[in-house]
Amino acid sequence: MKSAVVQLPGLNRDCDMIAALTKISGKAPVTVWQTETEIPDVDLIVIPGGFSYGDYLRCGAIAARMPVMQAIKAKAEQGVRVLGVCNGFQILVEAGLLPGALMRNASLKFVCREVKLEVVNADTAFTRAYAKGQVIRSPVAHHDGNYFADAETLKAIEGNGQVVFRYAEGTNPNGSVNDIAGVLNAKGNVLGMMPHPENLIESAHGGADGRGLFASALDVIAA
């Protein structure tokens, strides 16, 4: 499968994401700049982490209004898989591709550490390599990862299986409601998550717990 990594001013995890996608699929992803109005024929689009536009206004608010986002929305409507990690998650929420909002961490501090994630839904295009209830490790590094949604939205996403990852008990780093760490859109082809799976894909680098997400999304589960 072919993949693309979106590049915007201030994003600084694009190289990590490119390395992860290349390692898992054996093919280097194409890169797409913020001003592009068309995206090549790919199967997976990734918006990596960082601090797009310095996080001014709100995290992801300016990036969500760049020309490339209209192209991403069009691809998502066609069923192309879209993954947003950390700032990428914030951008997808600001663009209206995912429900909820991401607020300042409850501690009011930047958090950079490893957490444990529970795989809540293993029957998705992004989690088929995992088992439901499996607990995996993943790094986090963010200041505004506190996921919030109103009661009606929470009921809907919990009931529809759109909550994909939850911080394991006692490891919630930011105060996210219901310990939510990653959510899908209703269609199931757009995933946003605050943790960084791209930083744990090789045992030599501390672990490979994140590998399953990319293997699932790229249809290379046996990789």
Curated annotation (Swiss-Prot):
InterPro entries: Class_I_gatase-like, PRibForGlyAmidine_synth_PurQ
Associated pathway: Purine metabolism; IMP biosynthesis via de novo pathway; 5-amino-1-(5-phospho-D-ribosyl)imidazole from N(2)-formyl-N(1)-(5-phospho-D-ribosyl)glycinamide: step 1/2
Keyword Ligase carried by entry: yes
SMART domains: GATase_5 (SM01211)
Keywords: ATP-binding, Cytoplasm, Glutamine amidotransferase, Hydrolase, Ligase, Nucleotide-binding, Purine biosynthesis
Single GO BP term: 'de novo' IMP biosynthetic process
Domain Glutamine amidotransferase type-1: 3-223
Reactions catalysed, as given in the entry: N(2)-formyl-N(1)-(5-phospho-beta-D-ribosyl)glycinamide + L-glutamine + ATP + H2O = 2-formamido-N(1)-(5-O-phospho-beta-D-ribosyl)acetamidine + L-glutamate + ADP + phosphate + H(+); L-glutamine + H2O = L-glutamate + NH4(+)
Classification via CDD domains: GATase1_FGAR_AT
Cross-referenced Pfam families: GATase_5
Primary location recorded for the protein, binned into one broad class: cytoplasm
Source taxon at top rank: Bacteria
Subunit structure, as described in the record: Part of the FGAM synthase complex composed of 1 PurL, 1 PurQ and 2 PurS subunits.
Protein name per Swiss-Prot or TrEMBL: Phosphoribosylformylglycinamidine synthase subunit PurQ
Gene this chain is encoded by: purQ
